[in-house]
Amino acid sequence: MVEKTVVVRPELCVGCMQCMIRCAEAHSQSKSLFAAIGEAILAKPRIHIGVGPEQKPFPNKCRHCEPAPCQEACMPGAIRSDIADGLKVVDQARCIHCGMCSMACPYYVIRYYHDAKAPGGRSIAIKCDGCFERLEAGLIPACAEACKTGALTFEDVNAVQKQGTDRLARAAYGVVRS
């Protein structure tokens, strides 16, 4: 069960794309922005800034759904959730580029990129992995660390849900009991 997650507050996003840059850097072989630019296979971001309502920037990333439609649609079983805290990750060695996961994802966050290291040099599915390697090292996800506006934060799921419930109650009734 996920206890902490990257919370997206699109109203605070300014579209600077620092989250995308830091995500790609965190998934590069060198883990260094300047060295990553020169790598033979360029790292790809797992978060993307799209256009949301009213033509405003919207940070879009995997929600690590439970149950996950992408995982259920993946015929070779390349999407698994046995990594820390139920994060859904793609086993790139098993991905056959059938596209089923991408079609099943309700948030359109699974992208396909060419990978010369994959068998036959084919394309593979890439999606947010929750920066599980950074979490294991005691760090927060790269996108949340990079975001200076607070549009992406790494927070306790239960606390965020309570804040949302309280905000709705205030809007509807004007008061909230503690």
Residue ranges and their predicted role:
Residues M1-S178:
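Non-ligating segments of multi-cofactor redox enzymes
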